Amino acid sequence: MVNNMTDLTAQDAAWSTRDHLDDPVIGELRNRFGPDAFTVQATRTGIPVVWVKREQLLEVGDFLKKLPKPYVMLFDLHGMDERLRTHRDGLPAADFSVFYHLISIERNRDIMLKVALSENDLRVPTFTKLFPNANWYERETWEMFGIDIEGHPHLTRIMMPQTWEGHPLRKDYPARATEFDPFELTKAKQDLEMEALTFKPEDWGMKRGTDNEDFMFLNLGPNHPSAHGAFRIILQLDGEEIVDCVPDIGYHHRGAEKMGERQSWHSYIPYTDRIEYLGGCVNEMPYVLAVEKLAGITVPDRVNVIRVMLSELFRINSHLLYISTFIQDVGAMTPVFFAFTDRQKIYDLVEAITGFRMHPAWFRIGGVAHDLPRGWDRLLREFLEWMPKRLDSYEKAALRNTILKGRSQGVAAYGAKEALEWGTTGAGLRATGIDFDVRKWRPYSGYENFDFEVPVGGGVSDCYTRVMLKVEELRQSLRILQQCLDNMPEGPFKADHPLTTPPPKERTLQHIETLITHFLQVSWGPVMPAQESFQMVEATKGINSYYLTSDGSTMSYRTRVRTPSFAHLQQIPSAIRGSLVSDLIVYLGSIDFVMSDVDR
């Protein structure tokens, strides 16, 4: 793979507004469909954004999927209510729009297709004919905006209860509980809600049995320790064999994207921590980088290294929990307690630096909240001396265990084709042999300056391979942390920029103009230029991204949060059919997900 996506690296002005007409895919599209078939939008997303006609959507998608270096992954799909957007110069008239974000692994490039829709004709054809993982994304788009998906195999609510009324991400839908009538749960309403949760196999195209025997339908969750959160999965069983299954999500949904429309650019940062609550600062990274692209902020080198250091600490913390709970799911209890001892050392270090443990909300627009405290280097050095030997003991005592290997090798296995079709990222994708780590191929926050390797599997992603890759990723994160310790730059911890929020405190004590700016930015919030920006990062569980739309206000017009766990849970039925219930437990443990990352 050639790392040629330089518009997303630090060497290029990643926040510059570009139409990407020089991208080869624009020429390929125009050669095939004509020079006037599309409207190309200039954005700060770092990728080509092309408006296509609804009638051409499937044809264009099929063309991109069959190019010599094809766009093989549907990374994201969602919508936007355009009715109140004022800065739309040069764009097709639209009350609503739907976007399709595609990735070409061979090109290391993306493209975003957009379709403009009228309020009186809200419909698009289903993309599931080209990409099976469009299924859940289209269900959520219909649920949140009321955009009909023609030909969809099962267009029902996915995040909200089946009895919910309205489409929450429309601009005329209330964003606060105080704008609704007081909630009442009558006996009749409770019975209605319980009835709505009843699983009817016929609704999902499932048979209740064959001519000779009946199938059994088993509810696993939403309150089950092996479900790793408020997650329900309905199993169609023939004895112990899983004939089919239906994942049921949404129990942890909190409306994170709607919150983004009611919080200032600055005050939304704490909400990012809670998208994937184990990831801490890793979650803050894509959001603040996307906002900095809107603002045109380039942060000092010290900020970049500090952000990388905190991200890798949280990556190790999350991976330790994942590995130990996976071992516990297979049947061994002791490693969990050992892992929590190691995680406590990380929490002590994170708390010393940020003041918090799990949800630090410490990154800022243009920098970090404050400089590193005295003694941070001693704590980090002690941890780096401690952790490598512990990893060796985990691997020797538990992960090389023949029982664990027998329970996990060859279980829930899939190849590169299946991984790409379902939008799998992170270790699940790399286990299939595809070397794709955003830190390497689309470096951000100075990752291009670090020396580390990307662990890759041998061609098949099974439960055991996924776990062992995470172990090696831990070692590489320790390697990155050692470089942070040895090469921490001197300099400021905030950028000298008018939109840095809050601005450097020292100046507020000397200049009344800076004090006024400080007051406005932490109360109303900074005003970001009207534009669109996008940032993806290699998070703890796969690729996490923020796609932000500013309409020149103190708040985001649209905040789209793409999480890896959402895509990974959609893949469950295709990977587990024909396996046993005991295999499902091992598979769920190997995915590495938390439900807040799924449900947002």
From Swiss-Prot:
This is NADH-quinone oxidoreductase subunit C/D. It catalyses: a quinone + NADH + 5 H(+)(in) = a quinol + NAD(+) + 4 H(+)(out). Its EC number is 7.1.1.-. In the N-terminal section; belongs to the complex I 30 kDa subunit family. In the C-terminal section; belongs to the complex I 49 kDa subunit family. Its main location: membrane. It comes from the Bacteria. It comes from Salmonella paratyphi B (strain ATCC BAA-1250 / SPB7). The gene is nuoC. InterPro entries: NADH_DH_suC (IPR010218), NADH_DH_suCD (IPR023062), NADH_Q_OxRdtase_suD (IPR001135), NADH_quin_OxRdtase_su_C/D-like (IPR037232), NADH_UbQ_OxRdtase_30kDa_su (IPR001268), NADH_UbQ_OxRdtase_49kDa_CS (IPR014029), NDH1_su_D/H (IPR022885), NiFe-Hase_large (IPR029014). Gene3D superfamilies: Cytochrome-c3 Hydrogenase, chain B, NADH:ubiquinone oxidoreductase, 30kDa subunit. One of its GO terms (molecular function) is quinone binding. GO terms for cellular component: NADH dehydrogenase complex; plasma membrane. It is a peripheral membrane protein. Residues 1-190 are annotated as: NADH dehydrogenase I subunit C. Keywords: Cell inner membrane, Cell membrane, Membrane, Multifunctional enzyme, NAD, Quinone, Translocase, Transport, Ubiquinone. NDH-1 is composed of 13 different subunits. Subunits NuoB, CD, E, F, and G constitute the peripheral sector of the complex. Residues 214-600 are annotated as: NADH dehydrogenase I subunit D.
